[in-house]
């Protein structure tokens, strides 16, 4: 065994990460790292990997936004369809009760709804239907509207300058929102422009029996004129 040179200088390298004197973490030169210097091209690959991840995140974000938009549109469409179905069902039920309202109108004409339990029932039913959005229309003197009114009698020649108005209401019409549930059956008269006012061709009143028959059958009624007209 050959002994070493007793005068050879021994070099001791302190590889401790923390300096025992200062307590601070020592910086390690790049060449002293366990892996040595970074392999060539690693920086470029890291940059390319980062770009790829950014593109992937952008793609997934776009997909998520598209799915969210599709769901929002679906939810709006579902709510709209649900409301439409609800309105249709409501209109169907209320339409079945219009005949009852006609009976109440005839009872009111005969004075049967002036007081008593029947008046209370009629008022409560009409209040409930009004709360659901039911609106009655068809009033004497208002302009005739073929969208809302069905004319079963007509007085006047409809000449130039005349305007058709409702002269008699044989059966009220009803609307639910913008939907016409039933047209009003009316008698129409033509107004003629006069001096500062309008002259109206008058139709003789129709008794309640005739109104009932016309409201149920929808037959035309021959207008009656008073003597001297």
From Swiss-Prot:
It is found in: Cytoplasm. GO terms for biological process: protein folding. Signal peptide: none annotated. Residues 13-24 have a biased composition (Basic and acidic residues). GO terms for cellular component: cytoplasm. Its main location: cytoplasm. SUPFAM superfamilies: Coiled-coil domain of nucleotide exchange factor GrpE, Head domain of nucleotide exchange factor GrpE. InterPro entries: GrpE, GrpE_coiled_coil, GrpE_head. One of its GO terms (molecular function) is adenyl-nucleotide exchange factor activity. Residues 1-49, 207-229 are annotated as: Disordered. Keywords: Chaperone, Cytoplasm, Stress response. Participates actively in the response to hyperosmotic and heat shock by preventing the aggregation of stress-denatured proteins, in association with DnaK and GrpE. It is the nucleotide exchange factor for DnaK and may function as a thermosensor. Unfolded proteins bind initially to DnaJ; upon interaction with the DnaJ-bound protein, DnaK hydrolyzes its bound ATP, resulting in the formation of a stable complex. GrpE releases ADP from DnaK; ATP binding to DnaK triggers the release of the substrate protein, thus completing the reaction cycle. Belongs to the GrpE family. Homodimer. This is Protein GrpE. It comes from Mycobacterium leprae (strain TN). The gene is grpE.
């Amino acid at each position: 065994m050959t002994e070493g040179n007793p005068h050879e200088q021994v070099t001791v390298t302190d590889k401790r990460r923390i300096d025992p004197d200062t307590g601070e973490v020592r910086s390690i030169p790049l060449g002293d790292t366990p892996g040595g210097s970074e392999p060539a091209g690693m920086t470029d690959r890291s940059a390319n990997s980062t770009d790829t991840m950014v593109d992937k995140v952008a793609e997934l974000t776009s997909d998520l936004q598209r799915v969210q938009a599709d769901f929002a549109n679906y939810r709006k469409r579902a709510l709209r369809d649900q409301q439409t179905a609800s309105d249709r069902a409501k209109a169907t039920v209320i339409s079945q009760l219009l005949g009852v309202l006609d009976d109440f109108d005839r009872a009111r004409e005969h004075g049967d709804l002036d007081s008593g339990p029947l008046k209370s029932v009629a008022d409560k039913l009409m209040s409930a239907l009004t709360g659901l959005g039911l609106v009655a229309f068809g009033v004497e003197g208002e302009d005739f509207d073929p969208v809302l009114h069905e004319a079963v009698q007509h007085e006047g020649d409809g000449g130039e300058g005349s305007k058709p108005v409702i002269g008699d209401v044989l059966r009220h019409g009803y609307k639910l929102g913008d939907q016409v549930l039933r047209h009003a059956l009316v008698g129409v008269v033509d107004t003629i422009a006069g001096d500062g006012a309008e002259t109206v061709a008058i139709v003789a009143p129709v008794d309640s029996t005739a109104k009932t028959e016309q409201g149920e059958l929808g037959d035309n009624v021959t207008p009656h004129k008073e003597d001297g007209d």
